[in-house]
Amino acid sequence: MTGYRVIHLTGIYYTFYRRKSFFFFFLEYLHNSLRVLSWKGIITKIAASPFVIVLYFNTAFFNPFKTLYENEKKKAKKNLKLTRENASLSIRKMHQYSAIIPSGT
């Protein structure tokens, strides 16, 4: 079958001659780029009907607010840990100073 190409575009098979119109070559290009994106983890799922192609994107790539939120969460956790350490240090210092202060004459 040298004259035919079969493209599997998200569940739909297109069979055509190699010398057909630009549209089919565009479909082939689209299919290859979708495959590459799904390999890289950007597209998680592809659903298709004869007229509509639905792409489910990985939100981490296209949702900067989510990553911002995650970063802020990490910072807050780190700050909380630091404040806990500082609090325990200050309590230790209080104990040291209370031991030094004479209880009476």
Swiss-Prot record:
It is found in: Membrane. GO terms for cellular component: membrane. This is Putative uncharacterized protein YJL182C. The chain crosses the membrane at residues 41-62. It comes from the Eukaryota. Keywords: Membrane, Transmembrane, Transmembrane helix. Partially overlaps YJL181W. Its main location: membrane. It is a single-pass membrane protein.
